Each structure stands twice: as structure tokens, then as C-alpha cells.
Amino acid sequence: MTQANNHANNHAMNIGVFIPIGNNGWLLSENAPQYMPSFELNKQITLKAEQYGLDFALSMIKLRGFGGKTEFWDHNLESFTLMAGLAAVTSRIKLYATAPTLCLPPAIVARMASTIDSISNGRFGLNLVTGWQRPEYSQMGLWPGDEYFGRRYAYLSEYAQVLRDLWETGSSDLKGEFFQMEDCRLSPRPQAEMKIICAGQSAAGMAFTATYADYNFCFGKGVNTPTAFAPTVERLEEAKAKTGRDVSSYVLFMIISDETDEAARAKWEHYKAGADQEAIAWLGLQGAADTKSGADTNIRQMADPTSAVNINMGTLVGSYATVAALLDEVVTVPGTGGVLLVFDDFLKGLDDFGTKIQPLMASRRHVTGEALAEVA
């Protein structure tokens, strides 16, 4: 047994699915599956995830897309209403919506979250985003000016404090630079502890996460390099040391699998050959608009031309056995709690994951059972 397998045996890994709330999921390619988002599609995906024992489903928010031949992310559902619908048709899986904090006041978000907590019987949590793509907000007159790029996490810190006050005590009197609460009330409060996700990778984002969040989401890096994200987790561990809070990292990967390594690689090369260069160029322009942040932000990685066909997220390409082994390596990085997965073809990809990949994973034996993993 490999050292990675030994480690994975001792460290159970949580797995979530990043559901495709926007058209075409996460592939900017004319050669990838082309589809519109719908409640029905996301319901099928989330129910499959629940069936296969996945731990959570997360939806993003995107208010304006990248255009191009594939009209990438020009078509998007809204996160809270989607997750409320999914909460009503699921029974076990945890659900996370994303709050566009420039659009929604924190007291309203706190109440929406409490409502979905009620629908789901305590299975709901929240992902907070500051907003990095100016046109998403300027189109509705809500962009606060480009100086906001340098103040995003000061704004988000006040926002999160209002949420925590309301969820934990039922009232907030915060008087800050961005928000002024006047005996603001919330009832009923959530029945379960409300968990917060943040995906900040800059120094300011890490400091925010270590102070206010429960989970940090970060990008995997490279193709078939499942531990290359380790320096990002190390930076969070340093930030956590200053706050003393328990925050774990979850890593985003795209899974492209097939019966053989060669077949999976051919699929990946085919997607890259059809890259939507117009949409990729738009992504690069939006990334360059933020001149206030450093080189360590998510958008800097997304816009890198190296593998922009899937916004440079970590990609695991191979046979079912290869992908299972690569995923088991992820959890060997100290501070890693799990992974967030996307697929080139979500319905088939989830079936393949649930029936052919997960049973081979040492880090998922708490889900599949020891005997099944050994037989496979």
C-alpha cells in the first residue's frame, strides 16, 4: 500500500459538488458539452450526489458572463432561490448558496439563510464573495468604484460580523464604516450552526477567512498534480495561527475520467482544442481591471493563459483508478478537509465517480465501506 493510501485511510475526506448554475459548467470550449442551467438539471445532479454519499453541494453566483462563441456564463440562475428549491427535494446532503455581498444587505441574507435552514432542517450554509468582476455590478448601478478592489475584505468583515451577530444573538447594533445597524433583529434564528465559506486567496482574503469563516475554498493547480495547492493551505495555516480558529481548506478540481488514461487524455485535449478564445480574452480583461490586489488572488489564477479552457482550476485526467489515486493524494496535505468537484459532463461524471472512482478511494471508505473498497 502506498504512503498516500496509508494517509488517506487515516484521514476521511469530505467531497462536494460545485453544481452548474451557469451554462456549460466550467469549460470554455466549443468542444465541451453545451447546456443551459435549469432547476431540473441541478436537481438531478444534487440528488445523484446525495445518492452517492457526497457531503455537500455548492452553487456560485454570476451576474454577467464572458460572452464569446459559447456565451460562457451569460446564462445563470440565482443561488439562494436555487438552493431553497434543492433544500425541499433533498434529505441529507448539505447545501451552500453564494451571497453577492454588493447586491444583498447582510440582514436580508441572514433571514434568507435562516429560511433555507428551516426548509432543509439545518443543512444550509453560506459562501460569501466580495465581487471581482466590475460589469456584474456596474450594470445595475451597484459598483462602488475601483477603490473597492483594495477595500473588499474590510467591507466583507463588517458584513460577516452582522451575519454572525444576527444568527448567534438575534440582533445587531454594529456601527461600522460600511454598515450601521440600529437594533436590527432576526427571528427565527437558524436551528443549526451556520457555516461560512470564503474563497479568498490573497493575504487579506486569508486573514478574513481565518477570522470569520469555517472553510476556505482554493483552486487546485495544474494537471494531475493533486498536492500542488499545498502552499495556499500553508498560508491559511499561518493566518489561522493568529486567530486560533478551526478553519479547513477545500480544493477545487475538475474530473475528466474514462476507462483508460489515454481515452481521458484524448477528451481533455479535444476540449482544449475547442477553447473559446473570445470568452477567455474577456476573462483576462476583467482580471486586469483589479490593479489594487496582488498576484495571489483567485482571478489572477483564473485568467492565466496556461489552461484557461477551464479557468485554470486543478484538473485530474485519467482512468477511474488513476483519478481515485490522485484524489487520495489530496488529503495528504495537512489542513485539507476535502475537495469540491466539477465534471466535464455532470450527470455521467457523477455516475462514474459514484460507481467507479469513489469505491477505489481509501479516503472515502467511511462512505463506501471497507469491503467494497477492498473488492474494487
From Swiss-Prot:
<feature type="binding site">
    <location>
        <position position="202"/>
    </location>
    <ligand>
        <name>FMN</name>
    </ligand>
</feature>
<dbReference type="InterPro" id="IPR050172">
    <property type="entry name" value="SsuD_RutA_monooxygenase"/>
</dbReference>
<dbReference type="GO" id="GO:0052614">
    <property type="term" value="F:uracil oxygenase activity"/>
</dbReference>
<protein>
    <recommendedName>
        <fullName>Pyrimidine monooxygenase RutA</fullName>
        <ecNumber>1.14.99.46</ecNumber>
    </recommendedName>
</protein>
<dbReference type="InterPro" id="IPR011251">
    <property type="entry name" value="Luciferase-like_dom"/>
</dbReference>
<feature type="binding site">
    <location>
        <position position="136"/>
    </location>
    <ligand>
        <name>FMN</name>
    </ligand>
</feature>
<keyword id="KW-0521">NADP</keyword>
<dbReference type="InterPro" id="IPR019914">
    <property type="entry name" value="Pyrimidine_monooxygenase_RutA"/>
</dbReference>
<dbReference type="GO" id="GO:0046306">
    <property type="term" value="P:alkanesulfonate catabolic process"/>
</dbReference>
<dbReference type="GO" id="GO:0006212">
    <property type="term" value="P:uracil catabolic process"/>
</dbReference>
<comment type="similarity">
    <text>Belongs to the NtaA/SnaA/DszA monooxygenase family. RutA subfamily.</text>
</comment>
<keyword id="KW-0285">Flavoprotein</keyword>
<feature type="binding site">
    <location>
        <begin position="61"/>
        <end position="62"/>
    </location>
    <ligand>
        <name>FMN</name>
    </ligand>
</feature>
<keyword id="KW-0288">FMN</keyword>
<feature type="binding site">
    <location>
        <begin position="152"/>
        <end position="153"/>
    </location>
    <ligand>
        <name>FMN</name>
    </ligand>
</feature>
<keyword id="KW-0503">Monooxygenase</keyword>
<dbReference type="GO" id="GO:0019740">
    <property type="term" value="P:nitrogen utilization"/>
</dbReference>
<feature type="binding site">
    <location>
        <position position="127"/>
    </location>
    <ligand>
        <name>FMN</name>
    </ligand>
</feature>
<keyword id="KW-0560">Oxidoreductase</keyword>
<dbReference type="GO" id="GO:0008726">
    <property type="term" value="F:alkanesulfonate monooxygenase activity"/>
</dbReference>
<dbReference type="InterPro" id="IPR036661">
    <property type="entry name" value="Luciferase-like_sf"/>
</dbReference>
<comment type="function">
    <text>The FMN-N(5)-oxide reacts spontaneously with NADH to produce FMN. Requires the flavin reductase RutF to regenerate FMN in vivo.</text>
</comment>
<dbReference type="Pfam" id="PF00296">
    <property type="entry name" value="Bac_luciferase"/>
</dbReference>
